[in-house]
């Protein structure tokens, strides 16, 4: 069974005299590497180019320096902050036998001064202090991000690419309509198959055909729209082929097919949920809700008690998708226990109550789908399609 992710603190005993600790402040043009060497009074810091081999040579040199001071180095721990570079560096260092972690960038506490000093050197020292506290097993210093395999990262690309293409399609359609409205044309539909032919027949509100430059711009926009639609179709067809090819194999594709059996959930939503959250082996339902950002933000001080709303600290794709799915679930699963629970708590029909409770429903629904793919427990009263 895959190991459950619990990265809020280290569960390994920290022997400071036997552990070389290295942190990396990663930027686009350079890496600033700081270390804590057992037996060495100085706290070395070295600026490197973004080169993995040079970094490895520096780590081994620091290890030899600590060994020459009489320390038996049995553990090398490296950490850097999650960001643009992703996880390739962590995977590469792990292949060389180096214990590597990726720090959640929002989990490191910083000074609340209105104008605090910020440099790469100060950031490196801050990361080092947070990482040392995490290695000691103390909570609250920082938390780590689970390092996905390259296959897991690749599996997320189709859904994310499709989401981007759908946004591009909407922008192109809106741009075409906005251009036509300037000439008093409001009924043109750019998604029709014969849109190019209809465009040539259009007349402005002044009764004249579209002029050459405007017509050329619109034809190019329609060509872009056709290309985007073809790419979306290609991604969807490829996903269906992959699901059919792996019909007898356990894994993420089996989870997608299982979730897609729930009436009201399509292949696209199921694929997003599986690859973004449900295949991550999270510890419990609380960790699941926190990762999706579907938890509250309490604000308590003295006698004041209030809720500031959603934390929004997790995966925005999952949070947005679950809110949309919750509304859809009410429409397609009216007889389910979750739908009845929502109706009972929104009997006053107040808009504020419905908006608050839809978030609670989204959280409960996410947990129900997690139980479905991990234990096979079907949501109470939910309707299922026949097995694919």
Annotate each language-model stretch with its function.
Residues 11-37, 127:
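Gly/Thr-rich phosphate-binding beta-strand-loop-beta motif of the actin/hexokinase/Hsp70
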Residues 154-258:
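Glycine-rich, often acidic, oxyanion-interacting loops/wings at catalytic, nucleic-acid
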Residues 52-77:
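Short, basic/hydrophobic alpha-helical segments
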């Amino acid at each position: 069974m895959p190991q459950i992710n619990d990265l809020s603190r280290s569960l390994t005993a920290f022997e400071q005299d036997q552990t070389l600790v290295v942190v990396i402040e990663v930027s686009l043009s350079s890496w600033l590497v700081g270390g804590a060497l057992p037996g060495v009074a100085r706290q070395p810091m070295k600026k490197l180019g973004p080169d993995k081999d040079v970094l490895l040579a520096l780590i081994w040199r620091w290890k030899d320096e600590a060994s020459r001071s009489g320390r038996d180095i049995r553990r090398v721990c490296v950490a850097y902050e999650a960001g643009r570079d992703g996880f390739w560096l962590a995977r590469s260092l792990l292949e060389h036998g180096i214990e590597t972690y990726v720090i959640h960038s929002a989990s490191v506490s910083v000074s609340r001064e209105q104008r605090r000093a910020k440099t790469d050197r100060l950031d490196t020292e801050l990361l080092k202090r947070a990482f040392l506290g995490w290695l000691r097993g103390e909570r609250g210093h920082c938390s780590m991000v689970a390092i996905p395999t390259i296959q897991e990262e690749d599996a997320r690309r189709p859904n994310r690419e499709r989401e981007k293409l759908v946004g591009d399609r909407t922008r192109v359609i809106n741009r075409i309509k906005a251009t036509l409205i300037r000439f008093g044309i409001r009924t043109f539909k750019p998604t029709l198959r014969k849109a190019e032919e209809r465009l040539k027949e259009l007349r402005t509100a002044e009764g004249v055909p579209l002029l050459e430059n405007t017509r050329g711009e619109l034809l190019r926009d329609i060509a872009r729209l056709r290309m985007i639609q073809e790419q979306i179709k290609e991604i969807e067809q490829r996903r269906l082929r992959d699901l059919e090819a792996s019909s007898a194999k356990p894994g993420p594709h089996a989870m997608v097919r299982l979730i897609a059996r729930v009436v009201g959930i399509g292949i696209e939503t199921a694929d997003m949920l599986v690859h973004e959250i449900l295949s991550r082996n999270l510890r419990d339902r609380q960790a699941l809700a926190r990762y999706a950002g579907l938890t509250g933000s309490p604000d308590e001080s003295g006698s004041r008690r209030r809720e500031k709303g959603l934390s929004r600290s997790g995966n925005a794709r999952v949070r947005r998708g679950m809110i949309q799915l919750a509304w859809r679930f009410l429409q397609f699963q009216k007889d389910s226990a979750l739908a009845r629970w929502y109706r009972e708590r929104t009997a006053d029909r107040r808009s504020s109550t419905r908006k608050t409770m839809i978030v609670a429903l989204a959280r409960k629904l996410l947990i129900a789908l997690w139980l479905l793919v991990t234990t096979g427990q079907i949501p109470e009263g939910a309707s299922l399609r026949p097995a694919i």
